[in-house]
Regions:
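Outer-membrane beta-barrel translocator domains and adjoining extracellular loop/strand segments
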Residues: 13-19, 25-30, 64, 72-79, ...
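Gram-negative outer-membrane beta-barrel transporters
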Residues: 65-68, 86-186
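C-terminal beta-signal and adjacent terminal beta-strands/loops
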Residues: 123, 176-191, 215-264
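Short Pro/Gly-enriched beta-strand edge/turn motifs at strand-loop
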Residues: 32, 195-196
């Protein structure tokens, strides 16, 4: 199957809101975030092509996708800029890029293990892998600069092992992704091209998260649910250009939740 379509998305309120969110640092300097009311809407031409196979308790697909994007919106951290007479040490705002290109391949596989003897015939395996290449370009005073498409990992994989039979629905899943660009930076002493050359661009490091989900159906109306997210306590790590230049390190821990669902 194949498809071609156009899409349009307007900037979010926070991206276009001219009112600044101002925070004073301990050293007396100011940092803040302010939208850009001159942003153009995000426009994209999309093309998808895939081949799919449906078997007895199994599914497989392989696809190619391509997106030609205009006016993608990027956060831009600007150093030492003045707004309404107030000097900001760092101001995060938003800009449109000119042209962006994204293309890649996706593989999906799902297999029920119903050939196994009871009670193991409720087991299944699901896998997904996507590899993507994406770039954006921006016209500046001294030419055109090119950089990775924002928040787009080159490789993303997902694997789940589960059991779905009778009253039980159990899943253990792992999601992995490679690093991606978080936002651009603009040091007032350098051009954006020099910032790119000097690795003054913030990235989010690769990440793997393992989750466990269990659902038990008591009857047609009532079910119990138990989830464990981020079992291995994987942190989020952000860096400037290379991993040895730390920008931010967050630990969220492992979360546990239990719930009851009742359908009227």
């Amino acid at each position: 199957r194949g498809a071609i379509w156009r899409a349009l998305s307007r900037p979010g309120f926070g991206q276009a809101n001219l009112i600044a969110d101002i925070r004073e640092r301990d050293d007396g300097n100011y940092r803040g975030e302010m939208g850009n009311p001159d942003l153009d809407p995000y426009e994209a031409t999309n093309f998808d092509l895939s081949i799919e196979y449906y078997g007895d308790g199994s599914f497989a697909s392989f696809g190619y996708f391509k997106k030609d994007i205009e006016n993608a919106i990027y956060p831009l951290a600007v150093a030492n800029t003045t707004v309404n007479g107030l000097l900001f040490d760092e101001l995060l705002t938003f800009v449109n890029t000119d042209d962006s290109d994204v293309d890649g391949f996706e593989l999906n596989i799902f297999q029920e293990l119903n050939m196994l003897p009871e009670p193991f015939d409720g087991l299944f395996v699901s896998m997904n892998f996507t590899t993507t290449d994406g770039t954006s370009s921006l016209d500046v005073d001294n030419g055109t600069v090119t950089f990775p498409f924002r928040k787009l990992s080159e490789d993303v994989s997902n694997i789940s092992i589960g059991y779905d039979k009778n009253k039980f629905d159990i899943r253990l899943s792992s999601v992995s992704r490679s690093p991606y660009l978080d936002y651009l930076a603009d040091d007032d002493s350098e051009t954006i091209q020099e910032d790119l050359d000097n690795n003054n661009i913030r990235y989010t490091d690769d990440h793997t998260q393992i989750d466990f989900n269990l659902k038990y159906k008591i009857n047609d109306n009532l079910s119990l649910k138990f989830d464990i997210n981020n079992i291995t306590d994987e942190p989020e790590f952000y860096y400037w250009g290379t991993p040895n230049r730390l920008s931010q390190y967050d630990e969220y821990g492992t979360t546990y939740s239990i719930g009851i669902r009742y359908n009227l």
